[in-house]
Amino acid sequence: MTYTRYERARIVGARALQISMGAPVLVKTVKIDPLDIALEEFDADRVPITVKRQFGTCSEVL
């Protein structure tokens, strides 16, 4: 999936916040920093967050 840098930052930041609040981690890792874990999940395409883009009158869900 291709995301803009802004979408990527929003997804990783939101997931890092979820992890820091106690959400289960979806990849096996030895890291303890929520941001590093969120980046690993994003790179492994395991982040349970969707992006809704709007193009004119249509919308696309990624």
Swiss-Prot record:
GO BP terms, alphabetized: transcription by RNA polymerase I; transcription by RNA polymerase II; tRNA transcription by RNA polymerase III
Enzyme class, broadest EC rank: transferase
Localization, UniProt: Cytoplasm
Source organism superkingdom: Archaea
Family: Belongs to the archaeal Rpo6/eukaryotic RPB6 RNA polymerase subunit family.
NCBIfam families for this protein: PRK01099.1-3
UniProt name for this protein: DNA-directed RNA polymerase subunit Rpo6
Biological source species: Methanocorpusculum labreanum (strain ATCC 43576 / DSM 4855 / Z)
